[in-house]
């Protein structure tokens, strides 16, 4: 299990745990130090897997808030790039899969996912291949026909009312990564994308500083799920995660079988 040292009070929001994102793998499996005689490839230890909220172009998997780790090219415990990070799941093109993530600070909003199986992944590749939201397994968030890629974040009162808002000092609470709200959603992979080595990109788009277009049309469970009054986000959003709304990126290494396999 990952160490909890240094996590209290961090400005952090969430992470993908199913399938495990690279930053969460580094938290669970990484080491701070290993003998130079040990040939095992361990990821570089991550103490804040829920702090990956920007990226440097041409990156696409997230940059830690202190700028020390860029998960587009994860590093091993010796600081060398990990060329083939271990696969975390085998999925099937065109089929639904369950996505699990936790929010350690609840900023409303929604999540989106994309898949890329190119040898040289790019943000454009993820954008071309979005997963489609099918079902919220825990809280019953609705499918949005106008924005089928969105999985809306349930109000924190429906899950963990003790989760922080990310602004008050007590927001992190206790536990390995602080109080967290668990989410499990079904998303369907696009039918025409498969490969032995692919990336699932998870994006959390917060809704506390501005609202993405269309939020006012989602009356679930009432308009209390959103932050009405904060104004509409200016489009297009910045490519690197700067400015509003605050966003978080994670990537998970997976294999995607062809449709019908």
Residue ranges and their predicted role:
Residues 1-2, 38:
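Helix-centric, low-specificity signal for extended rod-like, repetitive segments
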Residues 2-18:
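N-terminal signal peptide
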Residues 13-260:
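Structured recognition/catalytic domains enriched at protein termini
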């Amino acid at each position: 299990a990952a160490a909890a040292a240094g996590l209290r009070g961090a400005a952090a929001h969430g992470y993908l745990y199913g399938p495990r994102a690279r930053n969460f793998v580094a938290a669970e499996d990484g080491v701070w130090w290993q003998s130079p005689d040990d040939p095992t490839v361990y990821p570089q230890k991550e103490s804040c897997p829920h702090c990956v909220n920007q990226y440097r172009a041409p990156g696409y998997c997230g940059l830690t808030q202190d700028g020390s780790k860029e998960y587009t090219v994860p590093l091993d415990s010796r600081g060398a790039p990990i060329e083939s990070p271990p696969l975390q799941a085998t999925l099937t093109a065109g089929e639904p899969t369950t996505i699990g993530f936790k929010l350690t600070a609840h900023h409303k909003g929604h999540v989106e996912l994309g898949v890329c199986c190119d040898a040289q992944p790019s943000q454009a590749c993820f954008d071309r291949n979005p997963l489609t939201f099918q079902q919220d397994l825990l809280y019953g968030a609705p499918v949005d026909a106008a924005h089928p890629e969105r999985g809306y974040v349930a109000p924190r009162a429906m899950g963990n009312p003790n989760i922080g808002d990310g602004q008050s000092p007590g927001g992190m609470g206790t536990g390995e990564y602080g109080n967290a709200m668990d989410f499990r959603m079904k998303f369907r992979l696009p039918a025409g994308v498969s490969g032995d080595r692919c990336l699932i990109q998870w994006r959390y788009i917060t809704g506390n500083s501005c609202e993405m277009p269309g939020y006012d049309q989602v009356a679930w469970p009432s308009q209390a799920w959103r932050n009405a009054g904060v104004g509409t986000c200016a489009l297009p959003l910045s490519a690197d995660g700067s400015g509003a709304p605050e966003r978080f990126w994670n990537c998970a290494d997976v294999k995607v079988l062809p449709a019908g396999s």
